[in-house]
Every structure is written in C-alpha cells, then in structure tokens.
Amino acid sequence: MNKEILFPNMSRSLHLFFLVFVVSVLFHAHDVNATTYVTFNDGRLYVFPDTCLQMMTQDEGQISFTAQDGTVYSYPLASIASIEEQLSKELPTFTSFKFNNKYNYQVITDAVGTITDDKVNVTVAGIGKRLTSSFTLSDENARAYVDGKEQESKVSRLRFDNNRTYVVGYPGDMILTAQPSGKYSMLPFGRTYTVNVDYLTDHSTSVPRIDINTVGSVNITSKIEYVDAEIIIDGAGVFPSMTDSVKIRGRGNTTTWSSNPDSKNPYRLKFASKVKPLGLTKGKNWVLLANKAKGSMMTNAIGMKAASLIGTPAVNHMIPVDLYINGTYKGSYNFTEKVGLSNNSVDLEDETTAVLLELDKYYDEAETQKFKTLSNSIPVNIKHPKFDEDSTMLTMTLIKNRFNQFVTCVLTGNDFSKYVDMDYLARYLMANEIILNTEIIHPKSLFCYNANLLDDSSKFCFGPVWDLDWAYGYNTTNVTYYVHNATADFYNWPLAQRYFIRGLRYGADTGQRLFGLWKDFMGDKLDELCEFCQDYYRYAAPSFANNKAAGLDNTNYAAQAVQAAQWLRQRANHIYEKVKAECVYPGDVDGDGKISIADVTLLINYLLSGDADSINMDNSDMNGDGDIDINDVTSLINNLLSEN
C-alpha cells in the first residue's frame, strides 16, 4: 500500500476522497507494531504508536485515535495533509552540548559533551549535580525538550544524577506517550538523546592535597611577614595539579589566628604572577580557610552555594583540601579566592577609580586606610585602594564623603536608591538572611564596592559575601550549627548596629525586590541548595575523616548534612511567607494600597485583553492558585462588597 499520502496538486474534494480511501486501507493493513504519522496542513506532525492505541476509526470526515486509557484524539480529515506509516521528515539533531562554567558556578572548566548517534557523554569536574546545559541544534527552528518541557540553552537547569532523555524536534510535533501513572498524553516528538554525565567526584577517594614546604622549613608565625615556599597541589583526579613557588603568611582575626605554628590557622597565599590553582580563574592572591570552629566545615561552602543561586557578585569557590605544611598534616581546609579587586574576585575594567570597602568592627587597617561614618560611627576599612601601593585617582576625603552621604541617607530614612545598586543589595541581604549570617549586623566582613567613585551616577554594590562561620543559628550560646533559630528575625537581631542593616532592608523598594527574588528562589533553587548539602558532604567526607583522626573536629558531618538541608528549607519557607505577607495585598490590582472598583475594572480588562502591564499579578491572584481567571474577579467583587 502507499506509505505516504500526499496529493499537493489535487483539488480539495479529490484530496479528501483519497485520504478517506487510504485511511480505510490503513485500517485493514495496519501492522501490529506500526506507527502512524499524521501531518497537518500547518506542518505539525502527530505520531501515534500502535502500542499506545486501542483503536483508530474514521467517520463523517473525522479520524480518531483512541489511547489505551480511553482518551480519544479526533481531527477533521480536511485539516490533514498526509497520513503515513513511515517517517519521511528529517529530524533535527544536537550539533553541540556542554556545561559551560560561565553558567555553572561549581563547574571549574567547561565540560564538552561527545555526541555519538543518540548518546551524549559529558565528564564534569565540580561539586554538585544540578547543571545548566549549553547546546546548539542543526536547525534554528528546532527545540529541545526534557519531560515535555522546552529547554533553553544557557538557562534551563536540571539535576543530572541519572541519565536524562532529551527530545530534539520541531514545535508542534507531538507523540502519544504512556505515562508512569498509566495515563496517556501527547508529548514533544523528535530525535531522542540520552545524556550521561560522569562526575569525577563520584570516582574520587580523596579531596585535593596541598603541600606547602617553606624554605628552610621555617614556621609560619606572622600575619604580616610572608615566608617563601613551594606549593604542590595534587588535584586527586578531579582538579588540575600544579607545582609553583609561593609566599605564605597567616591571616584572620584574633579568634581564628594563633602565633602557635601547631594550631589550625588560616593562611594567605601570594604568587609572583597570576596562576590557576585547581583550575580556578587566574589570580595572584588566594586563601586557605581553616574552618576552625567545631562543626563549621561546611558553612562557607553551603553559604557560597546559596550566594551563587541568589546571584550576588563575585561569589567565592570553596574547594575542600587536605593541607600539609612541611610534611605535617594541618587539617581539612577550604581553598578559595581572596576577596579584592582582581580578575578572580571583583573584576573591574578600571581599578584606578574604584573603591572596595569592608565594614568591620575589628577596624584593623592602618590609620590612613580606615574611617568611621559620621552617622552611627560604623567602622570602615578601605581595602582598595591601598594609598601607598596602588595607582588610584581617589582620595580619602572623596571616599569618606561619598560613603557618609549614603549611610546618612539610610539612617535618616530617606530614599537611598541613588547611592546603591538596589538589585545587588537585595541579593546580598537575601543571601545573608537565609543562612542567618549575623556577622554583617555587627558589622563584620561586610564588603561593598563602587566601580567609579568619580562618577556621581556610579553606585555602591554590596558583596562579595564573606565569612560565614557565625551563621546557621550558631552563636556564643548555641555553639551548634543548623539546629537553632531557623525562624529568627534577622533584622531584629539584638545588636546595637542593626539599624544600618534594618535601614537597608526596610528602605527604598528593597522589600518588593526581595519578594521577587524569593519567588524565583522557592522551588528548584531551594531544592538545589538543599541537595548541595549532601553533594558537598559526599565529596568532602574523606577529608572530614582525616580532620577528625587528627583530633581537630569530631562532628558527625553525615548527620549534619541532613540537618543543614532541613534547617535551610524551614528557614526559607518561613522568610518567604513573611515577605509575601508584607508585599502581597490580594485585590489591590493597581498597587495603590487600597481595594476599589478600579481594581475590578483592571482585572476584567486583563482577562479580556491579556495586557498585564497595568496590574500587579501577585495581588490579582485572589485565591493564590497561581492562575488569574474569573474566579479571582468574583472573589475581588465579594471582598469589595463585604468591605462596604
């Protein structure tokens, strides 16, 4: 029989006659395991595998396909261009597939996939299994789908802990498919690919090892004087290895640093030229964080993951390493970038007009590098420029004046949006609030920068996020993490300097911006953060065991990984409900702070026209079901009548 039914030169009536004839032939000659391909006049292709069908019928100019669950799909024969039992249409393909580190915070180097027939294999070096794929297709009109959902290159994010099935096809092409529930539905049709991701961390038995051997085996006892050394990094099969010369000294404050060389101290590393240790972005200056407090080994890694998901600037990477100095094991550390104006931290085009400030009660810079604000005497360290070292066009007076203007505006309750990047501010506050990082309230380690202080329109940007071991409910009373204070009010924390942070949170339009960020975060991003607790623990566990064996920390980190995810989820849900209650006023469609007949009119106009520019979508969803329909209009009218 004729496998392709297409009669482009026939009249409409003759075309229909032959379609009816061929359909009749198909009914009688249909193979048990055949597939029927229906092409419509508009170019859409619908595919019906025989294994999914009870029957196929034709009556009164209609063709109907009855699925195994009884669902009937009927189409007018007049809308059909052809019916075939073989696919004559060429399907689009993947031409490239990779995980670009630009869109994947945890992927150290681009992971390029190998495409062989219907398989894509990718090897990834990085901690965490949710990834954003970058791909190209053979036809610009084609699309890629996973589980029926269109995937956007460089945007869509999935968890790749198991094989993922992609469908590459054209919009509108569908296939009848059996669902796990026993139901049948139409899903995108196209070429099917199986994407397999091999994580190097799954095969590792240890984290990277860093050996630092000082010249003459001298001890490192100063936070000021550098010691010359050789550094040997073994990437342990996951990250690149390297050997180089380096300068090393101590770092940190009085609670983290000890002049006793046997202590688990934090260190600062400085290379003669820019290098890429462990494959990270090139830079001269790096840090070894000791995570000295009991139970703190995952605090910085989890916090930086949160910051990356929320989108704060210049997020640090936290790679667990085992550190040896002059052959002696020092413990499990985090290797990370040093916060500063540099291409591996805050990367700016011109540093001569830029300033990086740290609000910190330790106030430990030289007198020429620090000041206190006129309002509230907030201690400010000028981290860049170093006036006696850096090339700069700025002066101490200019820096003080500009920052004082900003702080005074905040503390007097005025609109400070002309001084600060409001988007970065909201992201910075959210990242610290979700982990309850009370350090920034003191303030300690609160960084902000301005790219061009000579330009009055250049704004202060809050970030990078830093120093996250006094967070997650940990304090001098509750010396445990991820147990206490999951519902604590961050902005009413009992510290005298909280008024600056409160002013930032409750001033300008910060609240509405936070609500938008929280709406975006709840769901996949929160899931990814909670999953990361387990992903990070699994990779770092051998190092935690080494640290414990050395008598440095006996915390049960397997249990803590579970507690951390639970604590974060509880806290996120609590904060989101508070922010939503603050920002959503059901019925206030026009956002003027009250409910009136004008709101009813706007909502009806939206339903008729689809024009959402003049309405507040959140306030319009009266019943909170995620859809705006006639039920919301009814609820709004009832509310309005009850108020009157």
Stretches with model-predicted labels:
Residues 212, 270-276, 290-292, 311-316, ...:
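Internal "kinase-insert"/substrate-recognition segments embedded within catalytic cores
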Residues 256-258, 262, 383-442, 446-451, ...:
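Middle-to-C-terminal accessory/interaction subdomains
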Residues 91-106, 182-245, 538-584:
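Regulatory N- and C-terminal appendages and interdomain linkers associated
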Residues 435, 584-590, 617-627:
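Acidic, divalent-cation-chelating loop motifs in proteins
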Residues 46-60, 72-84, 592-614, 625-644:
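Alpha-helical segments with a strong preference for the paired helices of cellulosomal dockerin domains
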Residues 227-290:
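Conserved oxyanion/phosphate-binding beta-strand-loop segments in alpha/beta enzyme cores
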Residues 15-26:
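Bacterial N-terminal signal peptides
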